[in-house]
């Protein structure tokens, strides 16, 4: 299965993104902000199922500039070496600039080591050291995630440069990340 949608990047408009932010953060919401939509491409993979290891999700950068990107908000696998991986729960989180595995620019959950609510094997849990980082595009572990949020390699540089630029523009040490489901997005947008 092709890990990226054939239709290109998500088609969510700026106005729709602003409506989501207003719903989740209120009228005086700060910008820039990131919006993650789990299951944005509901017909990609198994229809009606939240798939792993494909870019069937979306991540939106809303600030002075606006851009949508393909994304993955799930781990590449349900388990790795017998260990249940984390599916981050929908919610509002803070991220800061940082390195992924000390190798390249990424976003790291803030404050460092914060416990983020997640589900592992259907059980409520928490996860630490969640990043938004570059994913892969081919192979067995396409999205390169053990619970982090990932953007395809071919879109990564444009994504992270835009996010860092938006954060620098307003001198923001952190950026808000809203994670919702496709179903919640549809309810908000009416």
Q: Predicted regions: what is each one?
A:
Residues 145:
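Local cysteine-cluster metal-coordination motifs and their immediate loop/turn environment
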């Amino acid at each position: 299965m092709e890990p990226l949608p054939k239709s290109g990047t998500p088609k969510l408009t700026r106005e729709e993104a602003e409506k989501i932010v207003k719903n989740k953060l209120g009228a005086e919401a700060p910008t820039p902000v990131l919006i993650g939509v789990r299951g944005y491409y509901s017909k990609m993979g198994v229809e009606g199922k939240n798939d792993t290891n494909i870019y069937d999700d979306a991540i939106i950068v809303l600030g002075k500039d606006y851009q949508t990107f393909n994304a993955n908000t799930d781990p590449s696998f349900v388990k790795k070496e017998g260990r249940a991986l984390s599916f981050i729960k929908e919610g509002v989180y803070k991220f800061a600039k940082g390195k992924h595995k000390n190798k390249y620019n990424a976003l790291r959950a803030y404050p460092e080591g914060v416990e983020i609510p997640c589900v592992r094997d259907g059980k409520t849990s928490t996860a630490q050291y969640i990043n938004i980082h570059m994913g892969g595009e081919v192979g067995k572990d396409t999205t390169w995630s053990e619970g982090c949020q990932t953007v395809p390699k071919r879109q990564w540089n444009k994504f992270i440069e835009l996010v860092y630029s938006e954060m620098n523009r307003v001198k923001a040490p952190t950026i808000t990340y809203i994670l919702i489901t496709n179903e919640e997005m549809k309810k908000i947008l009416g």
